[in-house]
Amino acid sequence: APREYGPVLANLPRWRGSSPFSFAELTEFYRANGAGLFARHRAFLWEDGALCPVEQPDCPGADEMLGYELQRNRVIANTRAMLEGNLVNNVLLYGDSGTGKSATVKNLLTLPGFEALRLIEVQKEGLADLPRLIRTLGGRRLKFILFIDDLAFDQDDKTYSALKTILEGGLERRPAN
């Protein structure tokens, strides 16, 4: 290298050549984990039109999940089918407060074999911007659950029609992920 590159080269990291990654290993890593924020984080908040990573998500373990096994197993089976590339239905969990609806969804991030799953929490105020989020996520190999907690609508609520259009389908095709 030319001498003028000396100061620059001196500050570059020194990589050990003893265990290089093969192209196949790198490909498999990015296929399984995504890239950028999706490689480093599994839970996100959709806030003001941006994905914000959740550094320490509150994901209860299996030992904390008591009762409602039938319902939880259906959610797990539906999510597993999505991760396997099958078409799946949207899921609506309803019930009394404290019955584990939110915990059931958050627990999915702790399950073995669900490493390609990412969870994105969307507040009711962000529903109108949901098509933009869906376009952002479309085409990626990872699978996403859009999690809307404590959803309630007033009679004249405009966010209801935005969600209804997304759930029932509009002109844009729903991405497979």
Predicted regions and their residues:
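AAA+ P-loop ATPase mechanoenzymes
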Residues: A1-L70
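Pre-Walker A (pre-P-loop) alpha-helix and adjacent loop at the N terminus of AAA/AAA+ ATPase modules
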Residues: P57-V91
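Well-ordered alpha-helical segments embedded in enzymatic catalytic cores
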Residues: R74-N78, D129-L133, A162
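Walker A/P-loop nucleotide-binding motif
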Residues: G85-V105
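Short loop/turn elements that form and flank the Walker-type P-loop nucleotide-binding site
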Residues: N86-V88, E115-A116, R140-L142, R173-A176
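A conserved segment at the C-terminal end of the G1
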Residues: K106-T110
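AAA+/P-loop NTPase substrate/partner-engagement loops
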Residues: L111-F144, D150-D156
